[in-house]
Amino acid sequence: MSDLITDLSRRDFTMNAIALSADGMIADPFDGVSDIAKRTIRCVGEPKLRFTEDALRMFRALRFSARLGFTIEYDTMQAIEQCAPLAAELAPERVRDEIEKILLTTRPETMSAAISFGLMKKYISGAGWKTPNFADIADMPRKALTRWVAFAIMLRKYGYIPSARDFLMQLRLDGRTIRCCADAEVLLSQEPPRDDLGWKKMLNRYGVDTVTCAVQTYAVIYGIDREKELKNILKSGECFSLKHLAVTGDDLLALGLKGPELGEMLNFLLEYVMEYPDNNKREILLELAKYSEES
C-alpha cells in the first residue's frame, strides 16, 4: 500500500490520485472522491511543486475545468498565476495539444483564463484592445480546423497577436490549418459575395474548407450569418471547380488541345459554367470548346 500511496502522491490533481489497492479497497489518500463530489480541481500536495515538476499541468487544470465544468480551487489557481512563466519552457506541440482540447470543449472561453493567467505570453505579444468572446466558438462545429481558425483570427482582430498565420506556425499547427487560416483572414478583409456567382468564384479560389471557416468565423466576430447562402450553393450541385466540370482534360485532348491551351480552355469552360450552371453538359461544353478553338 505504501508504494501505491507514493505513486498517487506524484499525480497532478486529487481527482486523478484515486486507485484500487491490491485487496480491492479504494485508495484515496488526498480526498479525490470528495473533490469530485464538490466538482473541484485541486493539486495533490503543494501546487507550486506540482507545476514546477511539469508546467503543462497548468494547462491540464484549465482543460479539466473546461471539459468537466469543475472549479479550480483557490490555492491551485493562485499557483497557476505564480508559475505561469514556466509555461514558456514547454514544447509548442504540448501546448498546442492542450489548447486544442480546450477549444473542442463546450467551454472554449476557458482560453481567456489561460491568457489572463499569462500561460500564453510566449505566443501572445499584445495586451489586446478588447476581450474576445471565445464562448461564441462553442456555437461552431466541433472541428479542430474550424475552431483553430476562429480562435487565431479573433486574437488577431482584437490586437493580441500581429499575425494569425504566424501564431499557428509557432504552435506547430499542420500546414492545412495554417493555410486555411491565412486564406480565411484574407477573405474576412473583403466584402462578402453579393450573388451566387461570387460565392462560386470564392469557392473555386479558396476551397470549401476555407470558405466555410471564414463564413463561420465571420458569424462569430460580426454576428452576421452568411452560412445559409453558402450551404445553398453547395446543395445546388452547381459547378465551381474543375472536378465538377462535365468535361475533362482527356476530352479536350481528343479535340487536339494540349499544353497551355488545354489548361486555358478548361478554365474558360469553368468560368462559363459558373455563370451559366445549366449548361454544364458534356455535349454543350465540347461544342463550345470546338467553336472557341476554331475562332
Predicted regions and their residues:
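Charged, low-complexity, helix-prone segments enriched in Lys/Glu/Asp/Gln
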Residues: 15, 36, 183-188, 213-217, ...
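Hydrophobic, well-ordered secondary-structure elements that form the walls
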Residues: 185, 252, 256, 276
